[in-house]
């Protein structure tokens, strides 16, 4: 599921699973840091990630705390419904998780607990690899 290549971590699903591959790098937060604002890339607080990361499809009952939602959690299915996603898009939704739960609803938003804050010292930059770059 994960392989180290130099200073990079390549996250990949189990063999045979139709999931995308990701590239992840961590680095010290620069003074002029600006969070990534792309559907295929996130920058999060590396120290807020607990344990290993894994990639999987959304499961029934999955909950997370979308960045920007001040309190509580929301079902991923409700979040996607609120954004007018089709049933097919919901079924294909992918998440990156750590041991505590969802870190990133891919293509949508990060979980509030891993968002970069003023006190963040180490950034974890995760990006979706294009299909032609998957290993």
Give each language-model segment a name.
Residues 1-135:
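AMP-forming adenylation/ATP pyrophosphatase catalytic core
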């Amino acid at each position: 599921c994960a392989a180290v290549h130099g200073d990079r971590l390549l996250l990949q699903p189990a063999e045979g699973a139709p999931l995308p591959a990701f590239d992840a790098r961590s680095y010290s937060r620069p003074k002029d840091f600006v969070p990534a604002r792309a559907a295929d890339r996130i920058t999060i607080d590396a120290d807020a990630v607990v344990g290993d990361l894994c990639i999987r499809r959304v499961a029934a009952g999955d909950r997370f705390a979308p960045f920007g939602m001040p309190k509580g959690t929301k079902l991923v299915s409700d979040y996607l419904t609120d954004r007018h996603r089709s049933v097919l898009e919901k079924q294909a939704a992918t998440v990156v998780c750590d041991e505590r739960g969802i870190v990133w609803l891919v293509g949508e938003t990060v979980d509030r607990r891993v968002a970069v804050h003023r006190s963040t010292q180490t950034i974890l930059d995760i990006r979706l690899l294009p299909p032609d770059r998957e290993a």
